[in-house]
A protein has these predicted regions:
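Compact soluble domain cores
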Residues: 22, 26-33
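A short, surface-exposed loop/turn module that caps and links secondary-structure elements
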Residues: 31-53
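Enriched for short, Lys/Arg-rich terminal
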Residues: 2-6, 13, 17-24, 56-59, ...
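A short alpha-helix capping/helix-coil boundary motif
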Residues: 7-9, 29-30
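A generic, residue-level signal for flexible/boundary positions that often mark functional hotspots
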Residues: 12, 38, 50, 77-78
């Protein structure tokens, strides 16, 4: 089963602001996790329960994995100092 990545408007806006090299790294990483999105991510806790984090160098991608629809909803992207 392959999941589909669906970016939110906030994710798309912040993604466009990133350096082209970083964008390429993030795209490549997200394409690799579509087969098994929980294998490399980490579940978040507290006020972000139900969301997952992917670590890509100094950047983080926050997602919500929807198993019933096979969707990875990309919520936020940014440098680790700014994302939480």
């Amino acid at each position: 089963m392959t999941y589909k990545i669906v970016p939110t408007p906030k994710f798309a806006k912040n993604f466009k602001k990133l350096d082209p090299f970083v964008r390429k790294q993030i795209k490549s990483y997200l394409n690799r996790v579509t087969e098994n999105p929980r294998a490399k991510g980490k579940a978040l806790v507290a006020n972000r329960t139900g969301q997952w984090r992917y670590r890509i160098g100094a950047y983080r991608v926050i997602v919500n994995i929807q198993d019933d629809e096979l969707i990875i909803l990309a919520l936020e992207v940014g440098h680790r100092r700014d994302i939480y």
